[in-house]
Amino acid sequence: MLEGIDLQAMRGERSLFARLSFQVETGECLFVQGENGSGKTSLLRMLAGLTPPSAGIVRWKGSRVQQLRDEFRRELLYCGHLSGLKDELSAIENLVAGALLAAQPVASCVVRQALHQAGLQGREDLPVRLLSQGQRRRVSLARLLLQRRALWILDEPLAALDAQAVRWLAELVDSHLRSGGLAVITSHQDMALASRLHVIRIGV
């Protein structure tokens, strides 16, 4: 279970949100909505243990995220709103390198198959600088097929995706939740999921 208790995020002297509480159980998705600058990315970084909350507590399986550290990171897959890809490397090279850094090495043939599922057949060996924004987003999201983690935290994963890719991602998230995973997602767009979905809106 992922739990936020009385969370607050500050930007300078301004409070983005305060006294925010929620629980996400196994098989559930927390869908976070809000305008630009409302604190969605700040919230996700708190939940991922990357930045501490200005106030409040984040717990994973009953323990504070800041205390778990490496144990928590082994169960987390965080995709920020930036792709994190190296422009000069191919899609395959980026994902192979990322899997090594995550201590879950995978063969290039497995990566190629994941990229095919992401709709990138024929573009796997191109430098990512030659790919469109939507294709770069698909490369980044293909990590979901390669790294087996219980908790997915996805910041604006639908950005630049076409309708087909949005459906693919929704099916991927549903499959993850059916297998006992959890997900936290931010987006300006709606996302049709068959699984149990909790929606919160911040910055209002």
Feature map (PLM): residue ranges:
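Conserved ABC ATPase "signature" region
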Residues: 96, 108-123
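Conserved ABC transporter NBD signature motif
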Residues: 53-72
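Helix-to-loop junction immediately C-terminal to a conserved catalytic motif
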Residues: 48
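Catalytic Walker B motif of ABC-type/P-loop ATPase nucleotide-binding domains
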Residues: 152-156
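Hydrophobic anchor residue at the start of the ABC signature
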Residues: 141, 180
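Conserved ABC ATPase signature
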Residues: 88, 127-134
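Q-loop/switch helix immediately C-terminal to the Walker
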Residues: 82, 87-103
